[in-house]
Swiss-Prot record:
Chlorophyll a 1 binds at W83, S89, E102, R222. The N-terminus of the protein extends into the stroma where it is involved with adhesion of granal membranes and post-translational modifications; both are believed to mediate the distribution of excitation energy between photosystems I and II. Residues 1-37 form a transit peptide. Chlorophyll b 4 binds at Q168, R179. Chlorophyll a 2 binds at H105. This is Chlorophyll a-b binding protein AB80, chloroplastic. The lineage of its organism: Eukaryota, Viridiplantae, Streptophyta, Embryophyta, Tracheophyta. The chain crosses the membrane at residues 103-123, 155-175, 223-243. It comes from Pisum sativum. The keyword Ribosomal protein does not apply.
């Protein structure tokens, strides 16, 4: 009788991670357990043994001439070269937030840089699809005729900046919401690298290769952010696209360079 009683108690008292739960656990308990599991998976170290990009012996910002890294920069995450003069990563919460912002901005910058250069490259090689210079193409929506996507009026003919804004907010917001919320069932444990349908090519299947791809993504993303900043400055100063500016510089580097434009730049002209 005692044995059957204890066995029925064991069956009616499920456990989660070694902790006994009630028969009808509250949503708060399950939510806390799910959050704990997601948090532990998110903060799991990605450093791989023998990788030159992770760990205490990783590549530093000045190579062999680098000073001692701050104690909080352990080489656990990609893109950590042991340099943080301003102490932006000292607080773990701030570091986690800034790390996410950097990765997301890197991805947008890489897409943006490609979008600024590729149409102009095609146009200079005989492919015609309307305005090719990135900032001039976007401004066409304010013209009387509106903006034709890819120069084709039958594709998307945009005449309202508010409609474009609303469409982007809905489409981009839906994807971002899916990523941040961890998917409809909470199956995504790392919102920065969600995998699944966000990785149709299976690039994250090999942990070693995936760890290296994270470093490559950040390195290229940081370059892309600097590139986008340069494209903005070029657009303001010269009124030309990046490839046209490059061609002008190569044709006459003495008169077409950053110094000559900086000394002769007059705002509004």
């Amino acid at each position: 009788m005692a044995a059957s009683s204890s066995s029925s108690m064991a069956l009616s008292s499920p456990t989660l991670a070694g902790k006994q739960l009630k028969l009808n656990p509250s949503s708060q308990e399950l939510g806390a357990a799910r959050f704990t599991m997601r948090k532990s998976a998110t903060t799991k170290k990605v450093a791989s043994s023998g990788s030159p990009w992770y760990g205490p012996d990783r590549v530093k910002y000045l190579g062999p001439f680098s000073g001692e890294s701050p104690s909080y920069l352990t080489g656990e995450f990609p893109g950590d070269y042991g340099w943080d003069t301003a102490g932006l990563s000292a607080d773990p919460e701030t570091f986690s937030k800034n790390r996410e912002l950097e990765v997301i901005h890197s991805r947008w910058a890489m897409l943006g840089a490609l979008g600024c250069v590729f149409p102009e490259l095609l146009s200079r090689n005989g492919v015609k699809f309307g305005e090719a210079v990135w900032f001039k193409a976007g401004s066409q929506i304010f013209s009387e005729g509106g903006l034709d996507y890819l120069g084709n009026p039958s594709l998307v003919h945009a005449q309202s900046i508010l409609a474009i804004w609303a469409t982007q907010v809905i489409l981009m917001g839906a994807v971002e919401g899916y990523r941040i919320a961890g998917g409809p069932l909470g199956e995504v444990v790392d919102p920065l690298y969600p995998g699944g349908s966000f990785d149709p090519l299976g690039l994250a299947d090999d942990p070693e290769a995936f760890a290296e791809l994270k470093v490559k993504e950040l390195k290229n993303g940081r370059l892309a952010m600097f590139s986008m900043f340069g494209f903005f400055v070029q657009a303001i100063v010269t009124g030309k696209g990046p490839l046209e500016n490059l061609a002008d510089h190569l044709a006459d580097p003495v008169n077409n360079n950053a110094w000559s434009y900086a000394t002769n730049f007059v705002p509004g002209k």
